[in-house]
From Swiss-Prot:
Name assigned to this protein: UDP-N-acetylmuramate--L-alanine ligase
Disulfide bonds: none
Any one Gene Ontology cellular component term annotated for this protein: cytoplasm
Lineage: Bacteria, Pseudomonadati, Pseudomonadota, Alphaproteobacteria, Hyphomicrobiales
Naturally occurring in which organism (per UniProt): Brucella anthropi (strain ATCC 49188 / DSM 6882 / CCUG 24695 / JCM 21032 / LMG 3331 / NBRC 15819 / NCTC 12168 / Alc 37) (Ochrobactrum anthropi)
Family: Belongs to the MurCDEF family.
Compartment(s): Cytoplasm
Pathway: Cell wall biogenesis; peptidoglycan biosynthesis
GO biological process: cell division; cell wall organization; peptidoglycan biosynthetic process; regulation of cell shape
Broad enzyme group: ligase
Binding site for ATP: G114, T115, H116, G117, K118, T119, T120
Substrates-to-products reaction catalysed: UDP-N-acetyl-alpha-D-muramate + L-alanine + ATP = UDP-N-acetyl-alpha-D-muramoyl-L-alanine + ADP + phosphate + H(+)
InterPro entries registered for this protein in UniProt: Mur-like_cat_sf, Mur_ligase_C, Mur_ligase_C_dom_sf, Mur_ligase_cen, Mur_ligase_N, MurCDEF_pg_biosynth, UDP-N-AcMur_Ala_ligase_MurC
């Protein structure tokens, strides 16, 4: 049974969140009556209002109004006044992933999972299905530049969604195709240990129906180990690994664009080659993500020409190596990377894309993450000539003794880096960058906090610095 249209007013608590806003937008486009609230105004809130969705700023019991159903994300606390009011009214409380699962029942669905690369890969799958005239509905965890939004309502039979593994609810998603980009020990506060993370991803793939399949990265040791344990579902492997079913080869750079070929081999021995693919993004990690999208597209019957065209015009995702400006020949970028694996991949891509130097500005995100991955953070900046570390973005966490940005700078140095520095805040960045950066250099701002605002302000601040 699909969700009926007469379920009444649906109220989203935290509607401005990147995951919640996309679901609300698609529900609204399907004809459901949607409203919501968020603790602050934002671009997502404004976009929803422009589409005719009522959004309250601030959380109050009366915001519930005549709602018949309430949707919450894991970020909503149990004492939230709207959640308390909804429970008092005995309204159904629906988790974000459960509502996403209901939407997926309207379409055939591709779900993209993995510790890193989900948002970009989701966007790439959407772009290739779009190029193949399948007109997909898309719900992503980031703003897709081609759409200007994280959600898109298509008229086709397919839906492409990002599957967030952070709280285990991705196992509710009824996907026909499950993509796994990589598996790393993240979200242990929920899972307890890495073995439970592994088990969750195994279940994610095994949840696809017998006529579906998994698409899994053979370059990642944990994913390859998982492939060997999946016994009763069809798997399509991808990567640079010579054993991959869909393998990228001949990867080279053309400025900030990646050029590569793909070889597709069936288990019956047939081989297909797609040559001269161009992805307007640097980095082997992005080529790997593109190869995952190609694997999905090929299985769905999309032609090589459409794949080539879809990749060539791929516009990227906001906060994924996003260019924010130029100052004195210095290119400035903003990136969401906040885990050592992500940071290493982004800086490697920057190194490949420029003949100049790479300056990394990082805002560590959460004391708990910094504490649990301290040694990994100390060793992930090798491709940056200079590392500038700013204060930790707490995300509401209490400090942990001995775990701070100054300590990280010290550890980066003792791990062998030649130039790591501490900056006390955004006001210190422009003078510091102006004294370091030269024409041809890349400055990459990294983090999941408010460093994105600094990245967009930096070009102007550097220009002002030059006038002093």
């Amino acid at each position: 049974m699909k969700m009926p249209l007469n379920i009444g007013l649906v109220h989203f608590i935290g509607i401005g969140g990147i995951g919640m806003s996309g679901i609300a937008e698609v529900l609204h486009n399907l004809g459901y009556h949607v409203q919501g609230s968020d603790q602050s105004d934002s671009a997502n809130v404004q976009r929803l209002r422009e589409k005719g969705i009522e959004v309250f700023v601030g959380h109050k019991a009366e915001n519930i109004g005549d709602a018949e159903v309430v949707v919450v994300s894991t970020a909503i606390k149990k004492n939230n006044p709207e959640l308390v009011a909804a429970r008092e009214k005995l309204l159904p409380i629906v988790r974000r992933a459960e509502m996403l699962a209901e939407l997926m029942r309207f379409r055939h669905a591709v779900a993209i999972g993995g510790t890193h690369g989900k948002t970009t890969t989701t966007s790439m799958v959407a772009a290739l299905l779009d190029a193949g005239h399948l007109d997909p509905t898309v719900i992503n965890g980031g703003i897709i530049n081609a759409y200007g939004t994280n959600a898109r309502m298509g008229d086709g039979d397919w839906m492409v969604v990002e599957a967030d593994e952070s709280d285990g609810t991705f196992l509710k998603l009824p996907a026909d195709i499950a993509v796994v980009t990589n598996i790393d020990p993240e979200h242990l506060d929920h899972y307890g240990n890495f073995e439970n993370v592994r088990a969750a991803f195994a279940q994610f793939v095994e949840n696809v129906p017998f006529y579906g399949f998994g698409v899994m990265c053979l370059d990642h040791p944990e994913v390859q180990a998982l492939v060997s344990r999946i016994e009763d579902r069809r798997i399509v492997t991808y990567g640079q690994n010579p054993q991959a079913d869909v393998r990228f080869v001949n990867h080279r750079m053309d400025g900030a664009a990646s050029l590569f070929d793909v070889v597709i081999r069936s288990r019956k021995g047939e081989a297909t080659e797609i040559k001269d693919l161009r992805l307007p993004m640097p980095g082997q990690h992005n080529v790997s993500n593109a190869t995952a999208a190609i694997a999905v597209a090929h299985e769905l019957g999309i032609s090589a020409d459409d794949i080539r065209r879809g990749l060539g015009s791929f516009g990227g995702v906001k906060r994924r190596f996003t260019h924010t400006g130029t100052w004195n020949g210095v290119e400035i970028f903003d990136d969401y990377g906040h885990h050592p694996v992500e940071i290493r991949a982004v800086l490697k891509a920057a190194r490949e894309a420029t003949k100049g130097r790479v300056v990394a500005i990082v805002q560590p995100h959460r004391y708990t993450r910094l504490a649990s991955l301290f040694d990994e953070f100390a060793a992930c900046f090798n491709d940056a000539d200079t590392v500038i570390v700013t204060p930790v973005y707490t995300a509401g966490e209490d400090p942990i003794e001995g775990v701070n940005s100054e300590a990280l700078v010290s550890r980066i140095k003792t791990a062998g880096h030649r130039d790591a520095r501490y900056a006390s805040g955004p006001e210190a960045l422009a003078p510091l960058v102006a004294s370091i950066a030269e024409p041809g250099d890349f400055v990459v701002c990294l983090g999941a906090g408010n460093i994105t605002q600094w990245a967009y302000a930096l070009p102007k601040e550097l220009a002002e610095q030059g006038k002093k």
